[in-house]
Amino acid sequence: MILFRLFTTLLCLSAFPLATTASADAPAPDGATCRYETLQVPALSLAGNKTGEATRQPVYVYLPPSYTESGTQRYPVLYFFAGYYESSDIAYLARGVEATLRQHEFIVVSINDVNSLHGTFGANSPVTGHWRDFFLTEAIPYIDAHYRTLATADGRAVGGFSMGGHVALRLAFEHPEIFATLYAVSPGVFDEHGLENAMKTWDQTFLNAYGAAYSPNLKKPFPHADYPSMDGSPEDLAIRAKWKKGFGELPQLIDAYLAQPVRLKAVALEVGMKDEYPWIPDGCVYLNDLLRTKGLAHTFVLTGNRHEFDAAIFEEGMGPFVARQFAKLAKPAAAAKAP
């Protein structure tokens, strides 16, 4: 499914319509407010890193208005990941998130994915720490233990922007047993020539973060990474293969996903036609074509946006899409012992 969204208008160009299931949740009363909480979550997966990352990491939680009124109801959760060099503190999305949560009952959780190099890429690295493990084995279980969540794949969505969109996409396709819904906005993904084109737009700061995540080498000086020379030498080609694997190797990712017994329930990709980094829309179009070729149902949204994510994009795109999927769930049963 390909959609064009220009400003607030949605134009469906596919024979397959969007799901029109309305939320089963009643809108919150006028004046009802969401609650925003900041946590410090144990992150032992990061122990021993070489970049000074703390073994407690911030996690930000938006609760719908009804959460404080009902002591037993459990809620589905959208896990969100921020872009490179951005804050994982999603207070800047307040208008869009709160408008969505006043209409639909789910929790939004932003797990920190930004480190001292300004981006983790959700990678397990001997340099920056095992961030993927932190997300999956520490942060999400912590949320399930401390909030009244629907701790099932159907009760979890994952989304993100740019680097965070890449994190969300990898998590979803690699772990459909944990997440059932994906919404990635301008994710970092490569087509066949993505690395070469992207290298033209990356500054040294980004190269350092990407290299430490995907081509770590503790024998090298800080930030302990190997960099491709792009000269075609055997050493360069070996390093380049590691760099391509980061945002690339999408056919391998999808083939590995198809080999699993579990399928995602809903997938959406959104990208702006005016993105300042042309390799990103090129990569998204490539991924869209790949998914279509593999017969995997998904929604592809082209907008008039630049490389950006704000409250309006959440309210008009990610929020409603996730809400439609959660609305298909049966009304959550009361929890016998709700945290």
Segments predicted by a language model, with ranges:
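N-terminal secretory signal peptides that target proteins for export/translocation
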Residues: 1-3
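Bacterial N-terminal signal peptides
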Residues: 6-17
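N-terminal signal peptide c-region/cleavage motif recognized by signal peptidases
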Residues: 17-23
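Non-catalytic cap/lid and distal C-terminal segments of serine-dependent acyl enzymes
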Residues: 23-339
